[in-house]
Amino acid sequence: MHANKEFKDFVLARDDLDCIVLPLLETMYAAPSVAPSHLYVILILLLMLSEDVAFNEGAHRRMHVPSVPWFAERAVSDISLGSLMLVMMLRTLQYNSTRAMDAFVHENCFAIISNMAPHVRGIENYCAQRVMSVVDVIGRRRKKREARAEVTEDETRLIVLLLELVATSLRPSMLPFNLELMYALVQRREVVDTLSVDMDTDIASLAAPLVSMVDFFENVVETERAAECHEAASGAPPPPPPRG
């Protein structure tokens, strides 16, 4: 695919790209027992696919995986190919950062997530929860290392990358399609609360607007609940929700 543009175009034009990508992801799942050279080839192939806008859009909107029997950590079903790819990139990054610490793996996972971020749509609950969980885990680890002046650039870059993904996925035009990510953000608001006052200005500047978004969302929910209680008790029409 790298040296033959015609072949790459042929592959990207296929309607069944999931048949190509799923075996690659399954092999990645067995990363501890996979030769590094094989993992490198898989990441390069996924990176080339993620550079195509049409692939990214199709992976999130049209290509759905009914079940993932090889994913042993929990039952995963009816997940978009895009969400599954994001889950696998995050899983690989976490494994790599705690054990192998292979710079090539890190860089390619970063690049794949970055390529897919602008096209995230219909993100599944498990993927949304995984994004926030990784931000939380890496943020806590970074905080401990910060106290010992041992913060690594990769930890900061990963937090920035994932906060950018969240912010992009929750922009006004995409929010209605990524409500699971909004719910995950609300449930884990303490994560962005902490990051909004981080000493790193890039992290703080990305987390602060997300805190404001959560505040507004919670205010709307509370207002609607109060209105429903008022209407049920008195039969009076509810007050209008606050405007953003």
What are these regions (language model features)?
Residues M1-S37:
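Alpha-solenoid helical-repeat scaffolds
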